[in-house]
UniProtKB/Swiss-Prot annotation:
Belongs to the three-finger toxin family. Long-chain subfamily. Type II alpha-neurotoxin sub-subfamily. The lineage of its organism: Eukaryota, Metazoa, Chordata, Craniata, Vertebrata. It holds the Pfam family Toxin_cobra-type. SUPFAM superfamilies: Snake toxin-like. This is Toxin Lc b. Has the length of long neurotoxins, but only 4 disulfide bonds, as short neurotoxins. It comes from Laticauda colubrina (Yellow-lipped sea krait). Disulfide bonds join 3-20, 13-41, 45-56, 57-62. It is found in: Secreted. InterPro entries: Snake_3FTx, Snake_toxin-like_sf, Snake_toxin_con_site, Toxin_cobra-type. Binds with high affinity to muscular nicotinic acetylcholine receptors (nAChRs), whereas it binds with a low affinity to neuronal alpha-7/CHRNA7 nAChRs.
Length: 69
């Protein structure tokens, strides 16, 4: 699997990691910086705490930055 790890950077995921994810959350700075984002690979869709949104998908490069998609 190939997933984004940053807005424009991709990486081949480790064996067994077939899920790409994009987490987003408000870090309290409001509109100054917008939501914080975390990109990555995983074996299963990560469990997140309340207030954190996550998108999981299972095709190559399916977790792009929302503004670059």
């Amino acid at each position: 699997r190939i997933c984004y790890l940053a807005p424009r950077d991709t990486q081949i995921c480790a064996p067994g990691q077939e899920i790409c994810y994009l987490k987003s959350w408000d870090d309290g700075t409001g509109s100054i910086r917008g939501n914080r984002l975390e990109f990555g690979c995983a074996a299963t869709c990560p469990t997140v705490k309340r207030g954190i949104h996550i998108k999981c998908c299972s095709t190559d490069k399916c977790n792009p930055h929302p503004k670059l998609a």
